[in-house]
Amino acid sequence: VAQREKGSALKFFIDTANLEEIAEAKSWGCLAGVTTNPSLYAKTGGALADFEPHMQKIAELCKGLPVSAETTATTVDGMVADGRRLAALAPNIVIKLPICEAGLAACRILADEGIRVNMTLIFSATQALLAANAGARYISPFVGRYDDIALDGISQLADMITCIKNYDWSGKNPDGVVEIITASVRTANHVVQAALLGADIATVPMKALKKCLHHPLTDAGIAAFEADWERVANA
């Protein structure tokens, strides 16, 4: 099991492009960042022309917190151009790139310019190591998608964490640190397992985030306290 640095803690990001969900999660006082992707933006019903203004709204809503915005280009030049443009929208925007030849090349160019990159769609430890060496500030392994094909995503996550935490990444990216974002989270247990392994971050959709928050015994206890207090108040 990977050993965490003293004083570090699992951080919660929300995986959505929905402004209301982001505002609600932020109101809880424990939100540390946001991740988005083209599919999540499509779910908002927004138009293509509104994509960048929408990312800007998220960044403004979450000032000081990293907000990952993904490029849709498929070439190095396109990814770099998209990345530069998105990064210019707000200082807290992180550029999300897919792990592929073009993604690695674009990552190195953007990282050398001081732009933070979140390398996504990571499914193996070798991909994670390549991304970190190309300058990725964040690495996003997708645990839930392993479950979809009856494989163990948590064991793959464990390998990635061990490999990344074995090394000092000083000078490789703008911050000299590589953080692992556990992504494609479907259940509260995914979050627990990520925390046990020492992942830095879990990015969680609102549905799963509420599963992390609520428990039937907690809900029953709150209802009982409220009922008892109402009897006291009405006595």
Predicted features and spans:
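Histidine/lysine/aspartate-rich catalytic loop segments that bind and position anionic ligands
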Residues: 121-156, 160-163
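Glycine-rich beta-to-alpha transition loops that act as phosphate-gripper elements at the mouths
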Residues: 15-18, 72-77, 97-101, 119-126, ...
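Catalytic cores of alpha/beta
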Residues: 20-28, 78-82, 106, 124-134, ...
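C-terminal alpha-helical cap/extension of soluble enzyme domains
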Residues: 164-235
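Conserved, mostly hydrophobic/aromatic
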Residues: 37, 95, 131, 194, ...
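Glycine-rich phosphate-binding active-site loops on the catalytic face of alpha/beta enzymes
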Residues: 33-34, 38-43, 121, 138-150, ...
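Active-site beta->alpha loop and helix N-cap motifs at the rims of alpha/beta catalytic domains
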Residues: 10-14, 18-22, 28-31, 36-109, ...
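Alpha-helix-loop-beta-strand connector modules within alpha/beta enzyme cores
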Residues: 52-67, 104-117, 153-176, 180, ...
